[in-house]
Amino acid sequence: MKSIDRLVAEHDIIERGLDVLEKAVGRIESDQPIPADFPQGAPDFFARFADKCHHAKEEDLFFPLLKERGIPEEGGPIGVMLHEHDVGRDCVRRMREASEGGQFDRAQFATAAKEFIPLLRQHIFKENNVLFQMAANVMSEDDDTDMDDKFTQVEQERNLIGMHERYDAEVARWDQEIK
């Protein structure tokens, strides 16, 4: 399904960001340098791309459709996903706070990142392998086409066009700089 494939493609970019974040944490903990823009750039990537672009599509459009099609929120997979979105936002907030005010609190950043990385990896696994499979079973072709159109509309309305390419390139650059 096109709309689900689109969410999975965004997961791929987010997972590459997690890989780079994990390498950066290793460098931070061994007191090695990281790119100067990374302490502020990484939380920005996860807040803007993972949350405002990706999670917003899920929360505002995709999950409500799944609820209409009978997938429960309370006590079900959607409720779990929403809770994990909130926990992830808190981790990103703490990473951002660690790099504010011209000071970089390496320990605070690393601690928040080490909580965030496994949380989001497990979250993506559950969505890709459980929730999206459930969605494919309850969504019609018309639902899929409509959802894909709504994803495009949201990207246009919220000035998110080009965000995939921008952040994919930024993650690739960081990956090259953080060995």
Sequence positions of predicted segments:
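Small-residue-biased structural context
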Residues: M1-K179
